[in-house]
A protein has these predicted regions:
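Flexible, active-site-adjacent loop/turn segments at secondary-structure boundaries
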Residues: 22, 28, 57
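N-terminal segment of the canonical double-stranded RNA-binding domain
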Residues: 1-15, 20
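A short, exposed loop/beta-hairpin motif centered on an aromatic-Gly-Thr core
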Residues: 25-36
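Short, charged, surface-exposed hinge/linker loops at domain edges
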Residues: 1-5, 35, 39-63
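Short glycine/serine/threonine-biased micro-segments
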Residues: 14, 29, 54
Length: 63
């Protein structure tokens, strides 16, 4: 099963790592390490999908 592409990058401004899923608009998370940002992103992804279902918003498939 295919999963969403994830970007992780260091933000000088935030002094930490940001992880995001481009296919899920505004789905991102912050962490002090790349691993922490990824862990937080998994939580954010689940919440994003749950909220989309609750609002009747289609969830785009992974590309």
């Amino acid at each position: 099963m295919k999963d969403y592409n994830i970007n992780i990058f260091y933000s000088e401004e935030d002094e930490g790592y940001i992880a995001d899923i481009p296919d899920l608009k505004f789905c991102s998370a912050f962490g002090s390490t790349p691993e922490e940002a990824l862990k937080e992103l998994q939580i954010a992804k689940a919440a994003w999908i749950e909220a989309a279902h609750a609002e009747g918003i289609p969830v785009p498939p992974p590309r």
